[in-house]
Amino acid sequence: MIDLIVFLGNYGKKYENTRHNAAWVLCDSIEIGSNAVWQSKFKGQYAKLPSSMTPGRAVHLLKPETYMNLSGESVIAAASFFRLKPENILIVHDELELKPGILSFKWSGGLGGHNGLRSIKSVLNTADFFRLRIGIGRPDFSSQGGDASPDISGYVLSRFAQSELDVLKSQVPQADSFFKELLEADEPQTLIKKWAKVLPSQS
């Protein structure tokens, strides 16, 4: 079962609606996030889902406010307090290797150069946790010329174009369905095939 859902992002006005904050954009739009009662705890914003949504057990939401590179500090604080194992944790994060708006549920795997995932792996001592990846796509640097270094950091820290936000938010109904099924699932692995790659309804 998933007992802790972590939405990765950077804290502060300057990072609102940036690509690296795709998980926060989604969180603020979906049912479980928009209806949550958030409080400052575990070095981030924390909420417990109402018992009506998770009968017989507690499920926790977390938005680390440590900045992306130190996300693990917030995750380990919550995981230790609630005595959770890595396999009970879902990390929701932006993903360069997926086209904008695509949602992809997976178990374990590489870090893809994502500093938030790297920090979490460091504190959990394993990469064996569930992920919901949100596609932000790779930028086209062809206009920079062959000698230019691709500015990936600048890309992920820049704001979504409105068209990209529209595509992401078109996934809210799908994301709501995913989280509903996830909260009801005794074995999250059974959902991987269905939710391995969910295309946006508009692009």
Swiss-Prot record:
Keywords: Cytoplasm, Hydrolase, RNA-binding, tRNA-binding. The record marks N10 as: Discriminates between blocked and unblocked aminoacyl-tRNA. It is found in: Cytoplasm. One of its GO terms (biological process) is protein quality control for misfolded or incompletely synthesized proteins. It holds the Pfam family Pept_tRNA_hydro. The active site is at H20. GO terms for molecular function: peptidyl-tRNA hydrolase activity; tRNA binding. TRNA binds at Y15, Y67, N69, N115. GO terms for cellular component: cytoplasm. Monomer. This is Peptidyl-tRNA hydrolase.
